[in-house]
């Protein structure tokens, strides 16, 4: 039994609140256990200079944490005048993952800005951001469809992410909270599509190694969790799902 009473391959309690903010074209508050992230999607009727004239759109992301998202207050990165390497890595990961399932040609010459703001952190903030951002993005695309600016919702598949790891005597566990993540021998983030295709796998041993058999076990656990997350995304999107499938 894990520190929070879950089974080894059990997700934390997940809730996706849609249309959480008034102004963005799409927004959600995603809760993954005690991790809470607000994800918003903004549609801009232009593309970056390097994309002009190509007839395709672009998806990019920004990621941040409020100062007391963590147990100890952290200084806002805007106060420092630059983002950290960790933040840059995460926002590139979010944008890259979403672009893998967006039909950029069907989107047209538009930019989708994804903003992920962590308001409470208890492990898995980047994977929660990706899972929530996908829903926010599809909600924004539905607005484009309703306005007849696109002929279909420009996504090719679903997308979700979770963490897996090897924690001391527990072995392989799914969806690590902070207490588990901080003592994990192996930590891995996995992003997959609804068709079971991998978008990204990030895995490292923390002063430890892992075998090929353990890698397979980690990926199996992640796949199971991601398919559950995609079912929750579909539930959150409601009737919009009919425009995707």
Swiss-Prot record:
Positions of phosphate binding: 86, 124-126
Enzyme class at the top of the EC tree: transferase
Catalytic reactions of this protein: tRNA(n+1) + phosphate = tRNA(n) + a ribonucleoside 5'-diphosphate
Matching CDD domains: RNase_PH_bact
Pfam families listed in its UniProt record: RNase_PH, RNase_PH_C
UniProt KW keywords: Nucleotidyltransferase, RNA-binding, rRNA processing, Transferase, tRNA processing, tRNA-binding
Record keyword DNA-binding present: no
One term of GO molecular function: RNA binding
The keyword Iron-sulfur belongs to this UniProt entry's keyword annotation: no
Gene3D superfamilies xrefs: GHMP Kinase, N-terminal domain (3.30.230.70)
EC number from the UniProt entry: 2.7.7.56
GO BP term, pick one: tRNA processing
Cross-referenced InterPro entries: ExoRNase_PH_dom1 (IPR001247), ExoRNase_PH_dom2 (IPR015847), ExoRNase_PH_dom2_sf (IPR036345), PNPase/RNase_PH_dom_sf (IPR027408), Ribosomal_Su5_D2-typ_SF (IPR020568), RNase_PH (IPR050080), RNase_PH_bac-type (IPR002381), RNase_PH_CS (IPR018336)
Family: Belongs to the RNase PH family.
Role, per record: Phosphorolytic 3'-5' exoribonuclease that plays an important role in tRNA 3'-end maturation. Removes nucleotide residues following the 3'-CCA terminus of tRNAs; can also add nucleotides to the ends of RNA molecules by using nucleoside diphosphates as substrates, but this may not be physiologically important. Probably plays a role in initiation of 16S rRNA degradation (leading to ribosome degradation) during starvation.
NCBIfam families: RNasePH (TIGR01966)
Subunit structure of this chain's protein: Homohexameric ring arranged as a trimer of dimers.
Protein name per the record: Ribonuclease PH
Organism of provenance: Bacillus cereus (strain ATCC 14579 / DSM 31 / CCUG 7414 / JCM 2152 / NBRC 15305 / NCIMB 9373 / NCTC 2599 / NRRL B-3711)
GN (gene name): rph
């Amino acid at each position: 039994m894990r520190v929070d009473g879950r089974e080894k391959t059990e997700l934390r309690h997940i809730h996706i609140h849609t249309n959480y903010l008034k102004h963005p074209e799409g927004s959600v508050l995603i809760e993954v256990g005690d991790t809470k992230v607000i994800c918003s999607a903004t549609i801009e009727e232009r593309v970056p200079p390097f994309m002009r004239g190509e007839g395709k759109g672009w998806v990019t992301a920004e990621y941040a944490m409020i100062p007391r998202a963590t147990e100890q207050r952290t200084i806002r990165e805007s106060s420092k005048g630059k983002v950290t390497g960790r933040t840059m890595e995460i926002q590139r990961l979010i944008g890259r993952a979403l672009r893998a399932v967006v039909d950029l040609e069907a989107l047209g010459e538009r930019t989708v800005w994804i903003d992920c703001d962590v308001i409470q952190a208890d492990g898995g903030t980047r994977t929660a951001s990706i899972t929530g951002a996908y829903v926010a993005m599809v909600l924004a695309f539905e607005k484009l469809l309703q306005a007849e600016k696109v002929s279909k919702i420009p996504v090719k598949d679903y997308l979700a992410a979770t963490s897996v790891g090897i924690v001391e005597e527990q072995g392989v566990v799914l969806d690590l909270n902070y207490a588990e993540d901080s003592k994990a021998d192996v930590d891995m983030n996995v992003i997959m599509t609804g068709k079971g295709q991998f978008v990204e796998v990030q895995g490292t041993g923390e002063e430890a190694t892992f075998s090929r058999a353990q890698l397979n076990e980690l990926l199996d656990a992640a796949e199971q969790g991601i398919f559950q997350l995609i079912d929750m995304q579909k539930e959150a999107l409601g009737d919009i799902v009919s425009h995707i499938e």
